[in-house]
A protein has these predicted regions:
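Long, solvent-exposed N-terminal ectodomains/accessory regions
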Residues: 22-187
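Extended alpha-helical scaffolding regions
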Residues: 395-500
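Low-complexity "stalk/linker" and mucin-like segments enriched in Ser/Thr/Pro/Ala/Gly
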Residues: 271, 279-284, 293-309, 329, ...
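Short, solvent-exposed loop/turn segments at the edges of extracellular beta-sandwich modules
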Residues: 389-394
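Short beta-strand elements bearing conserved aromatic residues within extracellular beta-rich modules
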Residues: 334-336
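Acidic, Ser/Thr
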Residues: 320-328
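Catalytic cores of secreted or luminal carbohydrate-active enzymes
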Residues: 200-292
Length: 500
């Protein structure tokens, strides 16, 4: 397998020939697949009987210059997503998607940056509010993409070359394949076969409702080979950040899609943050450049996400279930499940009067086990799954996540007060998509009598210590001075300078 190279530098490979066109009679559409394996024969049988929709109205989008292109000769009804020549010249068909199309689209791009100096496409896009919002818009517009994790989801430790699960968010808006170039191919085949297997009436209904891809996601996850019983869907086993290809059960996915009727579609739900304490203050409670001055990545929709930046020991969110849908009007039960995180440090308190829960997450000091995925994997994300249940089927997943920056080593006292934060300890990893490198250590001071915060002292190798007051001002003989923080975009180091 060829390694994936950096996005925006060079494509890994170019120019596979376009798929040949079907040469059948104009009034007789080709079958949905030329595959002759049992799944291919089954799909063509359904199509000939009129119970499978095939790929009419579906487009495929390859965004890596043909490096890992789906073989469209296997799917003669599937149309390559059209681009104008001017769009191709402008590379609008290359790299991360940049627009929400009106067509029904699934696609891929086997492109990535390295784990340390860059990121995979999903990690890059899910690390900003704008990126997550764009992915949500795609997902709810009948568009689904597959991207390899490359170096962003591999076990770390002695004798291992990986860095753990580096994703701040587990984005259900797309599919992440475990591996590098070509690892996306089995997923493209499975998605193509699933999309063609829907009953025509059901598929058109989902297309109009803009809910086709959430149902495809639900089918993929409920059909995974490791799931042995219904309740397994409510565990991390069904929701790894990146999926191994050998977990796919293509036939099961096809049969699940084929069996759906307008009244047996899986339920739907979304989330919204209802209450939250005042956010931490940049330059006082945490330190980042202008583009990273918020803890919030998403407050509503399919994902609620926070980057834990402020020095507080605990985070609290009250999240409400909204926009539920049950196609046959059946009652819904809502499940709130801790998928990742120390259960002694996470509480989920459900309301007795409203469809909401208050979630409290205390500081997690070390790597967080990532159960359910590949063995030996850990990360830095606490994750809660929220699912609607109609008694027969579960909804596609919604996630609430809290990400703890791996380049921070914090010490708290027994009451939860911050005592010290070391940003430059040996082996620390600064995720350039989320934080800057900070070559210092902060030790916090408190009034001995009242316990009120007095400020902190910043130590950096080769420099004199710098004292700050509780408002983040540098203490100088002539008086306190306000500072501003800037990130050097080349070195990714944070510096503090006098505010103008």
């Amino acid at each position: 397998m060829n390694p994936i190279r950096r996005i925006a530098l060079v494509a890994l490979a170019f120019a596979m020939a376009d798929a040949p066109s079907w040469a059948g009679p104009s009034n007789a559409p080709p079958p949905p697949t030329t595959r002759t394996d049992p799944n291919g024969l089954l799909l063509n049988q359904w199509f000939s009987e009129g119970t499978a929709a095939g790929h009419a109205g579906d487009d495929y989008d390859n965004r890596d210059g043909g490096h890992s292109r789906l073989d469209l000769a296997k799917y003669p009804q599937l149309r390559p997503l059209p681009y104008l020549d001017s769009q191709r010249v402008g590379k609008k068909d290359y790299g991360p998607p940049r627009e929400i199309r009106t067509e029904t689209v699934f696609g891929n791009a086997s492109l990535s940056g390295s784990a340390l100096g860059g990121a995979s496409i999903p990690r890059m896009m899910a690390s900003t509010r704008e990126g997550l919002g764009f992915l949500a818009g795609q997902y709810l517009a009948n568009q689904l993409y597959v991207f390899p994790e490359h170096q962003d989801h591999d076990p770390a430790g002695e004798g291992l070359s990986g860095y753990g699960d580096l994703y701040a968010v587990n984005p259900p808006y797309l599919v992440i394949s475990q591996g590098s170039s070509g690892s996306d191919q089995p997923f493209l085949d499975a998605i193509a076969m699933t999309m063609a297997s829907f009953n025509p009436e059901v598929k058109e209904m989902l297309r109009k409702e803009k809910l086709l891809m959430p149902v495809v996601q639900q089918i993929l996850r409920t059909s995974l080979k490791p799931l042995k019983q219904r309740e397994d869907y409510l565990t991390a086993l069904a929701h790894p950040t990146a999926f191994p290809a050998d977990w796919l059960d293509e036939e099961r996915m096809m049969r699940a899609a084929q069996s759906l009727t307008p009244l047996t579609l899986p339920p739907m739900l979304q989330l919204e943050v209802m209450r939250e304490p005042a956010p931490p203050r940049p330059g006082i409670d945490f330190f980042e450049g202008p583009a990273k001055e918020s803890e919030s990545l998403s407050d509503r929709g399919i994902v609620v996400a926070r980057i834990v930046r402020g020095m507080g020991w605990e985070r609290e969110l009250t999240v409400r279930v909204t926009r539920t849908r049950e196609w046959a009007g059946r009652p819904l039960q809502i499940h709130w499940r801790l998928l990742r995180g120390d259960p002694d440090l996470v509480t989920i308190e459900r309301s007795a009067t409203a469809p909401e829960a208050t979630i409290r997450v205390k500081w997690h000091s070390g790597p967080i086990e990532a159960p359910g995925g590949i063995p030996g994997l850990s990360g830095h994300r606490v994750e809660i799954g929220v699912f609607a249940d109609n008694g027969t089927d579960f909804s596609p997943p919604c996630f609430i996540s809290f990400y703890f920056l791996p380049n921070e080593r914090r010490t708290y006292d027994e009451t939860g007060r911050i005592l010290e934060t070391d940003y430059a300890f040996p082996g620390s990893f600064a995720d350039v998509t989320l934080t800057a490198q900070k070559p210092w250590r902060d030790r916090y001071r408190y009034d001995k009598d009242s316990g009120a915060p007095l400020g902190w002292t910043r130590s950096e190798n080769g420099k004199a210590p710098v004292d700050f007051d509780a408002d983040g001002r540098e203490l100088l003989p002539e008086g306190p001075r306000r500072l501003t923080y800037e990130e050097d975009l080349v070195s990714r180091r944070l510096r503090f300078i006098p505010a103008e």
